[in-house]
Amino acid sequence: MLQEPSAAFSLRRNSFRRRSPRSNVDDRGWNPLHIKARKGDLKSVKQLLDQGMDVNALAWGPKSKGVSALHLAAEGGHIEVMDLLLERGANIDAKTWGSCGWTPLHAAAKERKREAVKFLVENGAFLADDITDTRFNPPVHYCHGLEWAYEEMKKLNSESSSSSGGDTSSSSDN
């Protein structure tokens, strides 16, 4: 009698393995790419992308409405994984669904992953002061760590403008 459940489990496990990795999702709606990106497993993320997983696939679970692998890598502060995902075409400004509309930059800021925020801003992530959600609340309303992201972005912008500004006297010449 113990052999029947064991055999049934073995059959289910083997049939699960035969399915395409694109169809495997957990109770959060995460596929293997989401899971490996959140863990920061660069080798596995590369393998999954090489096997054809969609770099912009979104998770659809009770608490994962539109979360991408880039959101999860940013949340974990996994720079190398984020770099690979962007290299493969991940949307740097992908927004989650629902009232928040968080981008990967929001996710990194919420977890106070300074290097991830810096990396995203340097790679073109957009975070305007006037972004609002469907309730007209700015992201800072939902994420107490976001004030820091705005400060980091301003700091990076001022550093880049001061390094590229060089000679400003040409406009004041008479």
Swiss-Prot record:
Annotated stretches, region: Disordered: 1-29
Biased composition (Low complexity): 1-13
Repeat (ANK) residue spans along the chain: 28-57, 65-94, 100-129
Residues modified as Phosphoserine: S15
Tissue specificity field: Mostly expressed in flowers, cotyledons, leaves and siliques, and, to a lower extent, in roots and stems. Also detected at low levels in seedlings grown in continuous dark or light conditions. Expressed in male and female gametophytes.
An annotated Gene Ontology molecular function: phytochrome binding
Superkingdom of source: Eukaryota
Phenotypic consequence of F16P: Abolished phosphorylation by PHYA. Impaired repression of PHYA-mediated PIF3 phosphorylation. Normal interaction with PHYA, but decreased interaction with PIF3
Chain's role: Promotes anthocyanin accumulation through interaction with PHYA, especially in response to far-red light, high light and sucrose treatment, probably by triggering A3G2XYLT/UF3GT expression. Required for gametophytes development as well as male-female gamete recognition during fertilization, possibly by regulating mitochondrial gene expression. Represses PHYA-mediated PIF3 phosphorylation.
Complex formation: Interacts with phytochrome A (PHYA), both in Pr and Pfr forms. Binds to PIF3, a repressor of photomorphogenesis in response to phytochrome-mediated light signaling; this interaction may trigger the repression of PHYA-mediated PIF3 phosphorylation. Interacts with SIGE/SIG5 in mitochondrion. Interacts with RPS9M (via C terminus).
Protein name: Phytochrome-interacting ankyrin-repeat protein 2
Organism of provenance: Arabidopsis thaliana (Mouse-ear cress)
